[in-house]
A protein has these predicted regions:
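Surface-exposed strand-loop-strand hairpins of Gram-negative outer-membrane beta-barrel proteins
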Residues: 1-17
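Outer-membrane beta-barrel porins/channels
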Residues: 21, 27-431
């Protein structure tokens, strides 16, 4: 019953644009040793804006509108016993149909900066091993709001605090930061035309500290404001007190407050000021096999496993996953001539998603990615790399039934997906 957007299903589209995501790698080789360092957004990063807010924000408004109309009906029914005409279910107030309107917006930014240091040692011409550590600094920001909420023809602030037009607004403004460390080990074995490699990154424990300035409505003043509205409309004070003090009305208002507070906690409780939030990076296993049938051709296949089930997140959300993430990839690289190398690759990503895990504030879906790339060998010391890949995301559909009262419920259906294009440029320099 969104009067500003009555179409169903409704689309909530987020736009992300990252023009530059830099990374640097450095290796110093001497004898059997290789000292290595790198800087990159290893734990993920980017910005996304939802100009019309999120579906979970509208869910709060929609359920509040229905609950408000139920309360209005109960109040007017009790008021009739005292000869007071229906006020709150009239078309000039909440009405009876649960219609609502609101304005909303959401913007998120997340960067996990990683600085890696490590060393590799060549035990023989065929076998080498690596050990290192990555320091991770996490920095995130979330800003969003739900404002100008109206149920029927009644601005919601009028029954929360008539003197303050922003009394019903929900506003989120949160900065998060945290630090973690990732131990890394790896091995590499070469024999003839074959190359076998494995790497394991241990789980990175990160606790994000919130610094927030949030605003949430309070329904605690609802009884007094309804009572004052009656008196301002000419209803005797004794009758107004009797109507609002009726046990049925008191119970309905208590239930409304409990449900509203629970919805707010679910939506933005994670971002309360001063909280420390778990934001672990999962352990990661990578296995790879390379084969070169001729000197100019190299074929690679790989497997990745992310132990998401044991990477702690807010309210142990990771426990809702069926399993960790599995990735399979393959690629071919061909030296066309002394100056040009071309390549192509594919990757399948499969998450262990469940309906309960999905959340529009942060979600992933399975995908297939295809890429093409090339290297221009400028000279013996410099190579210019370019690449493009597109990710074909799957759809994850969920359904949920929310019981608002003994005789009223809402069924929600959601369809999550994404779209992604990446262009990359790199420069290799051999000193």
């Amino acid at each position: 019953n969104n009067v500003n957007n009555p179409t169903t299903p409704r689309e909530f589209k987020g736009k992300a644009f990252a023009p530059v995501i830099p990374s640097f790698q450095y290796a110093y080789n001497k004898g059997r040793w290789s000292l290595q360092a790198g800087f990159a957004l290893t734990g993920g990063g980017g910005k996304c804006t939802f100009d019309d807010g999120l579906g979970s924000f509208e869910k709060i408004v929609a359920e509040t509108a229905l609950a408000a109309c139920q309360l209005a009906g109960a109040v007017d029914q009790v008021a009739a016993q005292y000869g007071v005409p229906a006020v709150f279910t009239s078309d000039k107030s909440f009405g009876k149909e649960g219609k609502y309107s609101y304005n909303s917006y959401m913007h998120g930014r997340q960067y996990y900066y990683g600085l890696s240091l490590g060393a590799a040692y060549k035990f023989s011409d065929n076998f080498s091993a690596f050990a290192g550590v990555r320091g991770v600094y996490a920095s995130t920001n979330y800003y969003g709001y739900v404002e100008n909420i109206k149920v029927g023809a009644m601005p919601l602030y009028m029954v929360l605090d008539p003197t303050k037009e922003t009394a019903a607004n929900i506003e989120l403004s949160c900065d998060q930061s945290g630090v973690g460390f990732t131990p890394i080990i790896g091995v590499d074995f070469k024999t003839g035309k074959w190359n076998f490699a494995a790497k394991y990154e241990f789980k990175t424990r990160i606790r994000l500290k919130n610094k927030s300035v949030n605003q949430v409505p309070s329904i605690g003043n609802l009884p007094d404001n309804l009572r004052n509205a009656y008196i301002a409309g000419g209803v005797p004070e004794a009758a107004a007190n009797a109507i609002i003090g009726n046990p049925v009305i008191q119970g309905a208002m208590g239930q409304l407050k409990t449900q509203f507070d629970a919805k707010l906690e679910e939506a933005i409780g994670e971002y309360a000021d001063g909280k420390k939030i778990a934001g672990d990076i999962p352990a990661y296993l990578a296995l790879g096999v390379g084969y070169s049938p001729v000197n100019a051709v190299r074929v690679n296949v790989g497997f990745h496993w992310f132990d998401d089930k044991h990477a702690t997140s807010y309210n142990n959300r990771q426990e809702k996953l069926d399993r960790g993430t599995l990735e399979y990839n393959a690629g071919v690289e061909v030296d066309v001539n002394k100056k040009i190398t071309l390549s192509t690759g594919w990757q399948n990503t499969n998450y262990g998603l469940s309906d309960e895990y999905m959340d529009d504030k942060s979600f992933v879906v399975g995908s297939n990615s295809a890429a093409v790339g090339g290297v221009y060998h400028i000279n013996k010391k410099m190579d210019l790399n370019v690449a493009y890949f597109h990710t074909f995301y799957q759809h994850k559909k969920t359904s949920e039934k929310v019981q608002l009262s003994a005789n009223q419920s809402i069924n929600y259906k959601s369809d999550y997906t994404r779209n992604n294009n990446v262009f990359a440029v790199g420069l290799d320099i051999n000193f």
